[in-house]
């Protein structure tokens, strides 16, 4: 799994590629926690590079979504 972050105006674009499953999803948690410390107004999550995602990966994304929305931010998923 590869993870990259790009700032685009008031949005932060996150690109995840490879596999997002029970083995790799826990690796995202520290990155997501650091991202939330930045108090982003908008997150764009680009999943176009994913070859595989399982329920653990979906759970990690849903967790991030809930935290961003609770802080008043917008959350978009593309790809």
Would you name each region that the model predicts?
Residues 1-15:
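Short beta-strand/loop segment at the start of cytosolic alpha/beta domains
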Residues 19-79:
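Amphipathic alpha-helical interaction surfaces in cytosolic regulatory modules
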């Amino acid at each position: 799994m590869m993870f990259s972050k790009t700032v685009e105006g008031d949005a932060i674009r996150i690109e995840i590629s490879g596999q997002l499953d029970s083995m790799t999803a826990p690796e995202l948690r520290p990155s997501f926690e650091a991202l939330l410390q930045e108090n982003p107004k908008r997150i764009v999550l680009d999943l176009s590079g994913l070859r595989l995602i399982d329920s653990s990966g979906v759970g990690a994304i849903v967790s991030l979504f809930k935290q961003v929305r609770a802080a008043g931010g917008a959350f978009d998923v593309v790809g």
